[in-house]
């Protein structure tokens, strides 16, 4: 009987939520060039759990529960965290969002900007590794690498860390 309960618990842990396509102006396929990929263009919107993701165009890998989003990428999670970038690689099974180029992450008045940001939605950790800046109403901090936990308001920085404060 104990083995049955252990296996049920394991099965529950392995259960993944699916990424859903909410909207796209056009949907096409190119089985020769991009097998098993949905090619989406125009006001594309995806939903994954509590997050919405918007973009101009995307490749949706439904079998892999992942997507590549391009142009005016915007992620909204709950009512207090938003992210923007030119490109987003999103992996639904791990809830990992990889933003690239012109990236901004906004949470409760703090803005993180960089060109390379990975946001682990499952662990609520955003990290950058090619230089970044975090600003709030009074401070500006720059560093080469950083790790930011938005909902705990905790951050760790390394590599040429510089803090600018009015006092």
For each predicted feature, which ranges?
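N-terminal amphipathic/hydrophobic interface segments
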Residues: 10-167
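Hydrophobic h-region of N-terminal signal peptides that target proteins for export
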Residues: 2-11
């Amino acid at each position: 009987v104990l083995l049955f309960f252990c296996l049920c618990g394991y099965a529950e842990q392995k259960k993944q939520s699916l990424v859903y396509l909410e909207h796209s102006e056009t949907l096409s396929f190119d089985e020769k060039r991009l097998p098993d990929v949905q090619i989406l263009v125009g006001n594309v919107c995806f939903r994954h759990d509590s997050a919405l993701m918007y973009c101009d165009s995307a490749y949706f890998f439904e079998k892999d529960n992942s997507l590549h989003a391009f142009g005016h990428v915007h992620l909204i999670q709950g009512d207090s965290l938003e992210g923007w970038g030119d490109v987003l690689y999103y992996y639904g099974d791990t809830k990992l969002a990889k933003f690239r180029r012109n990236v901004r992450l906004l949470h409760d008045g703090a803005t993180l900007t960089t060109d390379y940001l990975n946001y682990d939605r499952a662990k609520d950790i955003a990290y950058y590794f090619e230089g970044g800046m975090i600003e709030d109403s009074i401070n500006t901090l720059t560093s080469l690498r950083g790790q930011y936990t938005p909902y705990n308001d905790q951050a760790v920085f390394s590599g040429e860390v510089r803090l600018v404060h009015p006092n």
